């Protein structure tokens, strides 16, 4: 963010010290509302509250403690500040967070297709009518960025093994929530118990913000280790699978898996593995994942040409496949235990 702001200032864009501080604070705090395991468990822990709502609540609480020092950061975060480009640097289809995590995750996952010209893109940023734009000579870098984003989602973030593990994690929390709701003795930290019992759903965010802030991955990891020996066969089986990386097999398809096939495989799980019907439903299930890599109906990535003409990358690009770029991609998954692969 600091580098992007400096590039804009060097090009004559007026950004005050207060605005720079506000934008940097906004980008540092904008994901503060993510809980353990980030997006994977966003709807499994603090149900009914998005991470954006939590981020704003944290920022407002900090602002009270800091005597209003974050007023500008909050305005930028909420897109209520007149210099729209500052919000776009924090949250848009070309925000610095996306640039950062694509660059970082490509490196650490070893997926070369996710590599982007980060420095080049930042140097091509400009402002026109208070909106963030990209100079025309940066169009190829933006094309590569969008292609890299698409590749990273389907090769890394939504890889079938990731989908299978993530769905197992969600199912484990769901089963634990059911047991806690039935008053079945189930080990949890006091913080995790608060959310599994649904108490947060009955109280305002501000009243449980400190409890949420105390949660981290270890609350979940320790619980899963303990639950591996829980008397409930469903919870213990799922936790042992995750602990020992005996992950469910996941199939991905461009078409939905038929209810008949899912029902058939569930029946095989019951017959060959001796599982109850509810247990089979936890280890054999189908669903879908979707992703949109670029939405021309939202704030567009605009390219600035020499005659001051602005054009959406969607139409300005000669290389990108428009239908593949703009359409929401939906893929269907089907998860089941590897042990029954011989019978299906």
Predicted stretch roles:
Residues 1-22, 32, 36-344:
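Histidine-centered, transition-metal-coordinating active-site segments
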